[in-house]
Amino acid sequence: MFEINPVNNRIQDLTERSDVLRGYLDYDAKKERLEEVNAELEQPDVWNEPERAQALGKERSSLEAVVDTLDQMKQGLEDVSGLLELAVEADDEETFNEAVAELDALEEKLAQLEFRRMFSGEYDSADCYLDIQAGSGGTEAQDWASMLERMYLRWAESRGFKTEIIEESEGEVAGIKSVTIKISGDYAYGWLRTETGVHRLVRKSPFDSGGRRHTSFSSAFVYPEVDDDIDIEINPADLRIDVYRTSGAGGQHVNRTESAVRITHIPTGIVTQCQNDRSQHKNKDQAMKQMKAKLYELEMQKKNAEKQAMEDNKSDIGWGSQIRSYVLDDSRIKDLRTGVETRNTQAVLDGSLDQFIEASLKAGL
């Protein structure tokens, strides 16, 4: 015999939670806007303006994530109720178990949509840039920066985000000195914004012939891509623009022209650079776009003391600004802000970061 009342209570609970989300996420307005966007994308001349078409496509994906999920929730809950009625009438435990399994799947889907309420910031839905900088410590720190780069690239891949290496400076022996990665996808900045800070590694160094334990630091800094229509005034006199040859491993594909571009904003000391295109003009445009994004983020941080402290972390690679500790010898990774801890260090280094990110977002960091 199976208990039907607890399942009916769950259906009622999910129905109420869905209704709350419909209001909070403005379902009716989003559904109407989705119809408008679909109509625009069906126009034969829409691709005459590729940037606008791409923006509409991105908007459609974001709208569908809300509208389609809530539509599926409504239909799914009705279907589960129907299955339960059949199970009771036929006294069929197999049908009952099928209904419960469908209900479990619906609850997980709803929980994912509820989590999007964490993304309430103005730019949470934007694409973003991730800067990783090796701290002092030479080869060991540079290898750690490379491990972080791999970890974030794996994480982004697992979430279906697109990644692009904008600039990378290789280490002298191993690893990297720094890297800038562009991460594109739905709520990329919202997902990654709490990852800004210093990451501490403790391990027996493979670069130490004595096998001694070393502590290394690398910093991560996340900032949103700013739309071109955002008004950020940059005085050309405040900029120093340098061009240089693209670094590479050698061979016939090395770029022998000075196409790489580095831009320094003298008043703030902010530096952006790009070398991923053979065209100096395109690299300069990309570096200016990053500069605009960084200056916008700096303005946002001036209005928010907590974010300002986060920006300070970027230049303070040491004990005081750590967000996470990776102690590989003890098989322990711990987030120092939320207390979330795991023993599965390899999974985390392979990109399994959601438990840390979700906890920090829920904590309002």
From Swiss-Prot:
Top-rank taxon, per record:
Bacteria
Effect on the protein of changing residue 252 to E: Loss of methylation. No longer allows ArfA to rescue stalled ribosomes
Report the PTM annotation. Answer: Methylated by PrmC. Methylation increases the termination efficiency of RF2. Is absent when the factor is overproduced.
Q: Name one Pfam family in it.
A: PCRF
Residue positions of motif GGQ motif: 250-252
* Mutation effect (residue 252 to A): No change in complex formation with TnaC-stalled 70S ribosomes
Q: Which GO terms describe its cellular component?
A: cytosol
In the UniProt annotation, what is the result of changing residue 205 to P? Answer: No longer forms a detectable complex with TnaC-stalled 70S ribosomes
PANTHER family named in the record: CLASS I PEPTIDE CHAIN RELEASE FACTOR (PTHR43116:SF3), PEPTIDE CHAIN RELEASE FACTOR 2 (PTHR43116)
Family membership, please give it: Belongs to the prokaryotic/mitochondrial release factor family.
Name of the protein: Peptide chain release factor RF2
